[in-house]
Amino acid sequence: MKEPLKGVNTQMADPNEAPTVPQPAATVLLVRDTQEDGIEVFLIERAAKTNFGGAYVFPGGKVDLEDSSDEFSEICQGVSDEEASSALGIEKGGLAYWVAVIRECFEEVGILLAYRKEGGNFDPEDESEKERFVNYRNRLNDGEKVLANMCESEELFLATDRLAYLAHWITPKIEKRRYDTRFFIAQAPEGQEAIHDGSESVNSIWIKPEEALKQFEEGKLLMIMPTIKNLESICGFSNTKELLESKNAINPYDIATIEPKFFMENG
């Protein structure tokens, strides 16, 4: 296998200092059916200035303090904080990861996993509604904490029940910026278009996981180890229904925490 971090913008920690405490983060594998047999996954290319710059990754980011707000317990559909925390193996605050991954997905690629309170999946109905949600996305990217207010104003529930918990990775201690990341998987809504933000991400592709791994081996796509391993876990499925049924059937207590370790070689 090619070296995953080669060519990717990362910062190594001082080995003489205590390791950085990892920050909570959440990431989502957005998948869709192809016209022929198989599935595609959405990857974004991180901007050179960002952490993991140059690498193709899944949409996601840090869990913000606001993601733990009590008001989200009334906005999230199908998953309670107790259920989310139990799945993640933590005492409380688990729902914040589900909220964060929906928020980050909307911020980074413009896909909003939500339901209308009147019933049915959220998809913009016309150009006016599209423009309104582009404005919400821009405000979120500018740092405004408008997600809860947006859901209230637009009469939406966050579709937390459409996210399947997939994996748990912690950045190695050798790296300066570390994340305690929960990976989720969800089917992309048919009526929404995924578009990278042009700031933190500079390119995006829908690609079969098998093809993404092939292009990594050929040196055409830069990727980091968590991306590679999660891509491997979704290979070989005929459609998203089969894939999501398989991942939803996983007992969350069987999902191991993965924290790669690096060792210095003599010479």
Regions found by a protein language model. Name each.
Residues 1-267:
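N-terminal leader/linker segments that precede catalytic domains of diphosphate-processing enzymes
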